[in-house]
Amino acid sequence: MFTLKKTLLLLYFLGTISISLCKQERDADEDDGRKMTEEEVKRSIITMTKEAKLPQSWKQIACRLYNTC
């Protein structure tokens, strides 16, 4: 019975320590994280579309599908 109590007590303390560490980490992330402005959102959307390198026409799509490029 005593070993069971020790084990449960140990698990309880390890759980509370891990929860407190997670909370500290989350609080640190919230301090750093600020709201993005509209301009930053627009910039990120533009850069994502530029990096995607989408085909400009149906000919390019067909070319890539059939490997005729």
Swiss-Prot record:
Record carries keyword Disulfide bond: yes
Positions in coiled-coil regions: none
Signal peptide positions on this chain: 1-22
GO-annotated biological processes: defense response to bacterium; killing of cells of another organism
Annotated propeptide span(s): 23-43
Tissue: Expressed by the skin glands.
One GO CC annotation: extracellular region
One Pfam family cited in the UniProt record for this chain: FSAP_sig_propep
Keyword Secreted in annotation: yes
Keywords for this protein: Amphibian defense peptide, Antibiotic, Antimicrobial, Cleavage on pair of basic residues, Cytolysis, Disulfide bond, Hemolysis, Secreted, Signal
Top-level lineage group: Eukaryota
Disulfide bonds: C63-C69
Annotated localization: Secreted
Sequence similarity: Belongs to the frog skin active peptide (FSAP) family. Pleurain subfamily.
Function: Antimicrobial peptide. Has activity against the Gram-positive bacterium S.aureus ATCC2592 (MIC=15 ug/ml), the Gram-negative bacteria E.coli ATCC25922 (MIC=60 ug/ml), B.dysenteriae (MIC=60 ug/ml), H.pylori NTCT11637 (MIC=30 ug/ml), and the fungus C.albicans ATCC2002 (MIC=30 ug/ml). Has little hemolytic activity on rabbit red blood cells.
Protein name from the UniProt record: Pleurain-A2
